[in-house]
């Protein structure tokens, strides 16, 4: 790309890591402790939050216009093997201050583990920034079964009292009207496992807005799918007698969002019974589409 008298060279992204490469990188002998220079400064809040968490995969195919995860980690999912994940769980249980609780079995989006193209040659030719917007690609395998199986294996570990999912769940992947890949019931199986065993009081999801016009610019699905997800979530919670509120995240001031849209957001979320605590005001982030709109 010419810039005046100079030429800017942009290297292509590195290829997606294979499972064996992921396992090697995570199997290195990490101390799982902060850098020694912080020893005299007392507890580090950010470290305390994630010290007993397990990162199961890298990458995100959501392609949200305000997000840089795909630029940093890639659009394609690089997943660790079950053996590597369980090895890390075992390491965590040996920590002297471990009390039996894993804070997160997750990734950039909690529920994209092992998801990839059925025919990866089609993916190699694809230039779309998202695999799930405006619709889910027919070539994308979105089965939640491998993830459900790992949750259950971790649950059965004798030293684990509870393993929570602290990463954000991509809820639209679990709505049958949006994601048709539920012929074997993998959505329902995953949702029951998640809601009954892995929610630490409340579940975080990110519809981001209620205005479909704004959501299209964000590359997010229509808010009607959040209604469908909430209905399913409430039904499963009621079935098992659980009171675990949904916590939806929203963005204000996003490009394409008008004051009227924010007024409607306030009214619609109030009608749904939400008392919003967390609304992020849009911050232009380098390397995002939303930054340059």
Label the model's feature ranges.
Residues 254-270:
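Catalytic cores of alpha/beta
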Residues 6-8, 39, 49-55, 65-76, ...:
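Glycine- and acidic
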Residues 91-247, 251-255:
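Conserved SAM/AdoMet-binding glycine-rich loop
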């Amino acid at each position: 790309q010419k810039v005046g008298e100079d030429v800017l060279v942009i290297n292509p992204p590195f290829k997606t890591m294979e499972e064996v490469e992921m396992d090697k990188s995570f199997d290195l002998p990490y101390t799982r402790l902060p850098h020694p220079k912080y020893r005299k400064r007392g507890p580090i809040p950010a470290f305390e939050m994630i010290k007993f968490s397990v990162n199961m995969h890298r990458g995100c195919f959501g392609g949200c216009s305000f997000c840089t995860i795909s630029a940093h980690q890639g659009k394609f999912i690089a997943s660790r093997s079950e053996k590597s994940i369980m090895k890390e769980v075992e390491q965590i249980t040996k920590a002297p201050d471990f009390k039996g609780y894993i804070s997160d079995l997750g990734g950039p989006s909690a529920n994209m583990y092992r998801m990839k193209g059925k025919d990866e040659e089609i993916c190699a030719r694809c230039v779309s920034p998202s695999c799930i917007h405006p619709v889910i690609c027919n070539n994308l395998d979105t089965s939640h079964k491998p993830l459900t199986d790992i949750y259950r294996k971790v649950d059965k570990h004798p030293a684990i009292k509870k393993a929570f999912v602290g990463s954000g769940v991509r809820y639209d992947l679990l709505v049958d009207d949006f994601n048709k890949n539920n012929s074997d019931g993998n959505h329902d199986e995953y949702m029951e496992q998640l809601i009954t065993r892995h929610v630490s009081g409340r579940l975080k999801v990110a519809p981001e807005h209620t205005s479909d016009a704004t959501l299209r610019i964000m590359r997010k699905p229509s808010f009607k799918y959040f209604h469908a997800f909430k209905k399913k979530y409430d039904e499963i919670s009621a079935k098992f007698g659980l009171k675990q509120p949904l916590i939806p995240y929203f963005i204000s001031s996003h490009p394409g969002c008008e004051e009227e849209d924010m007024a409607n957001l306030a009214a619609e979320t109030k009608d749904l019974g939400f008392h919003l605590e967390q609304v992020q005001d849009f911050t232009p982030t380098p390397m995002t589409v939303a930054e340059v709109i």
